[in-house]
């Protein structure tokens, strides 16, 4: 029997993918162009189909050389995910990790969805350590991005041979997150001297697509694609639209910036950042994507979550603030915040009507509660987040919680994180209201609310504290019970003693008289 010889070349598959990526960056041997909002990305069908179920179904139903993705997908996030398909690595700005997660859900890339979610949650926390972050490799070992190549940055002009440098990859299951050293919008902020505030619109390099066919083929959607898991693309600041400043003039204050009666937090003056005005159509698109993304949880029963019933709260000035149940948002408030609220708030309706905060989350809040949150917050997105969290979680729940679930060494291990579905819905709604609202800021505010709630609850316990000698242990309580049993005998003895003493007092006087 002939012997079989076997030879294995380590990391040969990685080197092939690396060479394919270099060919893609140079536009060599690419057989498909993916168009995202006018930006064209050349790629290989085989690599896309092997990485994404979305593209696999799409290529099975169409042989077109040009594929156009829906408008909800952002070019920057798709570029990063396309690089991941070739290299298995992600590189992004801090704060954009959830945008990538949701885009990966739309493209049905399960590796990012399954392995990256927990990792990105840790990275987005303000208390996370740096163990999960890997420094960027040298520029020579990292393939260039299409944006860099088109802008004329140095790049190889000739295709590299297949026997190219080999990267030593880590574990197949690991997900690397290499934060960029500089953000694309940092330079413009420094030039402006920081006076203009944070701009919600992410600045991306735009490049032309001369190789595109003049007539783009409409994207066919199969049944499997339509029912596939799709994710939200708005978290991280993807809602685009005409920018609008939230900052009021120095001499004018917003008419809708009063504090909520249910708020027990110490709220100082918060800076109001510039936001973006999202249209109803964009809101519906993103909500539809969230609905399809929720279908990832197949076989799981999603319970309906509703906001807490509103209660009239006594304030420190011994007066009751009466809330007005409005049928629709006031015109003055609409002029200030634009179309960034729930679409149904702009039409008149029953104040007790239950509105789904974000389509597909099964998290409901009454029209009156949501409207009062907006009226109280005005243009301040941080206050809006506090109002919404206070609408869903009462004081005791917040006090007994560890916030977003990211613990520090000083946290009580008995504290449980808040309901993740409610947190995600509230965060997403606030992200739609203010696209530049970062995930790390939201986590910090939620943790601060839990801390403040614990302080208030602790103060309410102080007057009811028992003296130390009353909580000594079982011996003292058993002694109390025993003394309770002998109390009648002691009373009878005391009564007889008093009688004897009186008789004793009368005795000598009688003897003297005699």
From Swiss-Prot:
Biased amino acid composition, Acidic residues: 267-279
MF GO annotations: DNA-binding transcription factor activity, RNA polymerase II-specific; RNA polymerase II cis-regulatory region sequence-specific DNA binding
UniProt KW Lipid metabolism keyword: no
Domain BTB: from-to ranges: 30-94
Summary of the tissues where the protein is detected: Highly expressed in the hippocampus, brain cortex, cerebellum and brainstem. Expressed in the nucleus accumbens, olfactory tubercle, the striatum, frontal and parietal cortex and ventral pallidum. Weakly expressed in the heart, liver, kidney, spleen, testis, and skeletal muscle. Isoform 2 is expressed in the brain and liver, less abundantly expressed in the brain than isoform 1.
Region (Disordered): 183-218, 241-279
Keywords annotated in UniProt: Cytoplasm, Isopeptide bond, Nucleus, Phosphoprotein, Repressor, Transcription, Transcription regulation, Ubl conjugation
Cross-link (Glycyl lysine isopeptide (Lys-Gly) (interchain with G-Cter in SUMO1)): 167
Entry protein name: Nucleus accumbens-associated protein 1
